[in-house]
Curated annotation (Swiss-Prot):
InterPro entries cross-referenced by the UniProt entry: AceGlu_kinase-like_sf, AcgluKinase_fam, ArgB, Asp/Glu/Uridylate_kinase, Glu/AcGlu_kinase, NAGK-C
Family: Belongs to the acetylglutamate kinase family. ArgB subfamily.
Summary of the function given for this chain in its UniProt record: Catalyzes the ATP-dependent phosphorylation of N-acetyl-L-glutamate.
Keywords: Amino-acid biosynthesis, Arginine biosynthesis, ATP-binding, Cytoplasm, Kinase, Nucleotide-binding, Transferase
Organismal lineage: Bacteria, Pseudomonadati, Pseudomonadota, Gammaproteobacteria, Candidatus Pseudothioglobaceae
Broadest EC class assigned to this enzyme: transferase
Annotated site (Transition state stabilizer): K34, K254
Designated name of the protein: Acetylglutamate kinase
GO CC terms, sorted: cytoplasm
E.C. code: 2.7.2.8
CDD domains (UniProt xref): AAK_NAGK-C
């Protein structure tokens, strides 16, 4: 028993020693985290995520959370008897659906995350992209055509980022708050738009020249056709994986924003397994991490590897 206790103490000491260099390296750095997937619905994972964010802030980092909430939106729509329609993974969003999206993302989900952070000793403020003109949006122009018809589908209030104004984020960081952001923007037409949370997180990370962009997923990272974790890719291989269908569906916007981010000022993007407790801390503060890391080398060639950058 004493031997086991000694081993446990040694392991804890090793982890803390390993983490120290990362605490020092990333002190004062901005980390944008896209929060979604199982980590948002499992109670234990929700708690561990909030603790991770508070610890990051406590050691001098500046975490910024951008969250999704698709399943929660779907549940409320079902309760009011409104059926959801998806085209290529995007929810067709009419005016009534957009009202629900704003209530769920800007209210229910956002404030739950803020409350969890507060429960674990952090100080957080929740907002949508409409607050402080944070996210200027534009309607997503879709050329999606359903099978067997040439009709072009109007996705309604589905948007994309037009511009990011980081003024309100900087005010919150200066006040030592953790920003928690719902991916809703407003267009020049005055309408609200629901935007893919991965793309919002990437746009905010680029605007802030963030040290890292972290995307939580329901997989162990970027996988090959055999389900094995990919840890050494360049941009050409990524393109071929998209072409042959290995990367598809919900992973496509993650890859798009990962590549765009590291091309536009973000030091590294991490696609990690949100099903693992304390995944964010393990990715940032340990040598091996829990996912796939995408970064640029000095020559500007994109590479992907599973080590801390």
């Amino acid at each position: 028993m004493l031997h086991n206790m000694s081993n446990n103490i040694h392991n804890i000491a090793s982890v803390l020693t390993e983490s120290l260099s990362y605490f020092q390296k990333f002190q004062g750095k901005t980390i944008v985290i896209k929060y979604g997937g199982n980590a948002m619905v499992d109670e234990a994972l929700k708690s561990s995520f909030a603790r991770d964010i508070v610890l990051m802030k406590s050691v001098g980092m500046n975490p910024i959370v951008v969250h999704g909430g698709g399943p929660q939106i779907g549940k409320i729509l079902e309760k009011i008897g409104k059926q959801s329609q998806f085209i290529d993974g995007m929810r067709v969003t009419d005016s009534e659906t957009m009202d629900v999206v704003e209530m769920v993302l800007g209210g229910l989900v956002n404030k739950e995350i803020v409350n969890l952070i507060h429960q674990h000793g952090g100080h957080s403020i929740g907002l949508t992209g409409k607050d402080g003109s944070l996210i200027s949006a534009k309607k997503l122009k879709s050329d999606i055509k359903p099978e067997l018809t040439s009709e072009i589908i109007d996705l309604g209030h589905v948007g994309e980022v037009d511009k990011i104004d980081i003024s309100v984020i900087n005010l919150l960081l200066k006040g030592d708050f953790i920003p928690v952001i719902a991916p809703i923007g407003v267009g020049k037409d005055g309408f609200s738009y629901n935007i893919n949370a991965d793309l919002v997180a990437g746009s905010i990370a680029q605007a802030l020249n963030a040290e890292k962009l972290i995307l939580l997923t329901n997989t162990s990272g970027l996988l090959d056709a055999n389900g094995e974790l990919l840890t050494g890719l360049d941009v050409n291989i990524i393109d071929s994986l998209i072409e042959n269908g290995t990367i598809y569906g919900g992973m496509l916007p993650k890859i798009d924003c990962a590549l765009s981010s590291v091309r536009n000022g973000v030091k590294s993007t991490h696609i990690i397994d949100g099903r693992v407790a304390h995944a964010v801390l393990l990715e940032i503060f340990t040598d091996n991490g829990v996912g796939t890391l995408i970064t640029c080398n000095e020559s500007g060639t994109l590479i992907t590897y599973n080590e801390q950058g």
